[in-house]
Structure formats: structure tokens, C-alpha cells
């Protein structure tokens, strides 16, 4: 959509909000995190539907927590959401010089070794609140193509697509499988996540924190068709910056068993979540689709 069409009065309130957020992203780093935590507190109070979803998810995934512990984790999660929003916008808008000292990459040699095979790399990730800034740190070292879900709001989609195209080299709608395969054929690193519940004929149910979760098998299928290596990729917020984690390429993947592959990927995500549970995107209805005979948990 042309930018001129996004300047009409219907978008003015959103433009105002974007202007405020632009200002917050240019605060010193510590102030920015503090502002993000406050945004999270406000969101916790106002977004009661998402708060309820996150609370249910935490109850399902961490049954050993008592009510007080779970509510404390829930509040920390919303703080992480607020910080994640400003981190995402910082990743879109700020120059490398403002960010590069904050990112510490662990395992870059695994990505380089996988790219040296010449058949492309699937950077398998998940929806953690520091996802965008983690990808930004990685783009300082290599070109990335990122699969994403287009936003329904045209103005947000404009900024999302424009920013990701400029920082990540190329943003690809998650349903554009042929375009993803072309990227892999060019030996590019393609970021892809399978941890959100979207109805899809290629989803299977696989264990996630002891519960069956509908899991997209696209990573397995892309790897099978292209011969690409699959390198797990996660980002964790620390006290003084961020740790970007690149693990060794998965052996014997895909295995030929989509359900077993989905379980393996879910276990990788679960292990990372347990390191910093507040930093995962709990406001998503991860357990929305249920196996036949099970009731809706939400």
C-alpha cells in the first residue's frame, strides 16, 4: 500500500502512537527498558483478555507454581512484553552503532558452518519477546530472510515490511512457500518459527510442556525439499543486553516422521523457555486447537 493512502485521518491516532513510541526508542537504553516495563504494567491492566490467555497458558505449562508464583510470573511477562515492543521498534529504527554493543552472539560458527554446505539454512526460532532485536544483531553478521505473518492493519504492515526488508534483507509472508524455497536455493539463512497455533492442513499435534499443541510442520517440509540445514536460534534478554544463541545444526533432520520432528522442535523451544519463562509470548492461544474429544481450554 502506498504511503500516501496511509496519511488519511483514520490513521492519525495510530500515527500519534507511532510518534510517541519513536521517541521512547531513542531514550538511553536503561530508560527505554524502564519505559517498556511501564507499558507492560499498563497493558496488564487494560488487556484483560490477553492477560487471561497468558494466565491459562502459565497454569497449563507450570502446574507446580502456586497462585502467588504464577501471578508474579504473569506480571513479569507483561513487563517483558512492554520491553519487547520497544526492542522491536529499536530493531527497526535505530542504527547499528546504537545497538551493536548490546548483543552478544553465541555459536555464530554453527551458522557459518551450515551456510558453507551451500544449501541454505533454516534458522528455527520461536516467539520470544526479544525476537526482533535478536534478529537485528544477527543481521550485523549475515543476511537473513525472515518468514512472517502479514499484519491486518495496513499502517503497521507498512512499517513491519519496510523495516524488515531493510534490516533483514527480505521479509517473506509465511504462506509464500515457493519464495522461501528460492531463498534457500540461493543459500540464504531463512528465519522460521512453528510455535503458533494457526489452522493448517500440515499441522500435527505434538507434546509441549506436557500438553498436545498443534505444531506447523513447515520446517521439516522445507528442509526435506531444499536440503537446508536447520539451526536453532533464540534470543534471551539479560541484565546488560542480549544473548543471541545459535545451536549446532540438527542431525538427522528431517527424520521422515513429521510428528517426531515437531516434538523435537517443541522440546528445543521448551528448554529455552525454562531459562527465562517470562520472555516467551504467553498471550498467544498456543493450545487453541485440541485433539478430537478435548475441550477448549480458553
Regions found by a protein language model. Give the residues of each.
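Short Gly/charged-rich anion-binding patches and loops
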Residues: 19, 53, 109, 133, ...
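Non-catalytic C-terminal accessory region of glycerolipid acyltransferases
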Residues: 3-8, 39, 43-46, 65, ...
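Catalytic core of membrane glycerolipid acyltransferases/transacylases, capturing the structured
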Residues: 117-175, 197-203, 207, 211
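Membrane-anchoring hydrophobic helices of lipid-metabolizing enzymes
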Residues: 2-125, 159-162, 166-168
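Charged, low-complexity surface patches
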Residues: 13, 47, 127, 153, ...
Amino acid at each position: 500500500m502506498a504511503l500516501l493512502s496511509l496519511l488519511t485521518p483514520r490513521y492519525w491516532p495510530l500515527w500519534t502512537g507511532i510518534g510517541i513510541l519513536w521517541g521512547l526508542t531513542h531514550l538511553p537504553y536503561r530508560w527505554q527498558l524502564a519505559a517498556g516495563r511501564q507499558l507492560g504494567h499498563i497493558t496488564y491492566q487494560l488487556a484483560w483478555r490477553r492477560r487471561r490467555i497468558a494466565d491459562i497458558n502459565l497454569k497449563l505449562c507450570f502446574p507446580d507454581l502456586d497462585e502467588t508464583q504464577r501471578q508474579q510470573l504473569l506480571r513479569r511477562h507483561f513487563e517483558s512484553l512492554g520491553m519487547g515492543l520497544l526492542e522491536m521498534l529499536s530493531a527497526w529504527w535505530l542504527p547499528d552503532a546504537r545497538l551493536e554493543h548490546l548483543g552478544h552472539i553465541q555459536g555464530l560458527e554453527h551458522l557459518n558452518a551450515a551456510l558453507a554446505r551451500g544449501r541454505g539454512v533454516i534458522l528455527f526460532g520461536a516467539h520470544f519477546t526479544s525476537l526482533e532485536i535478536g534478529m537485528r544483531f544477527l543481521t550485523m553478521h549475515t543476511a537473513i530472510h525472515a518468514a512472517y505473518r502479514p499484519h491486518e492493519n495496513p499502517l503497521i504492515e507498512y512499517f513491519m515490511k519496510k523495516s524488515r526488508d531493510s534490516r533483514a534483507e527480505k521479509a517473506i509472508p509465511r504462506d509464500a512457500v515457493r519464495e522461501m524455497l528460492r531463498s534457500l536455493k540461493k543459500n540464504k539463512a531463512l528465519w522460521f518459527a512453528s510455535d503458533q497455533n494457526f489452522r493448517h492442513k500440515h499441522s500435527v499435534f505434538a507434546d509441549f510442556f506436557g500438553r498436545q499443541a498443534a505444531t506447523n510442520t513447515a520446517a521439516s517440509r522445507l528442509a526435506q525439499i531444499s536440503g537446508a540445514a536447520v539451526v536453532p536460534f533464540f534470543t534471551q534478554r539479560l541484565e546488560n543486553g542480549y544473548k543471541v544463541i545459535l545451536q549446532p545444526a540438527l542431525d538427522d533432520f528431517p527424520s521422515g516422521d513429521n510428528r517426531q520432528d515437531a516434538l523435537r522442535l517443541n522440546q528445543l523451544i521448551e528448554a529455552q523457555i525454562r531459562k527465562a519463562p517470562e520472555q516467551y509470548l504467553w498471550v498467544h492461544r498456543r493450545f487453541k486447537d485440541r485433539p478430537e474429544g478435548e475441550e477448549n481450554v480458553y
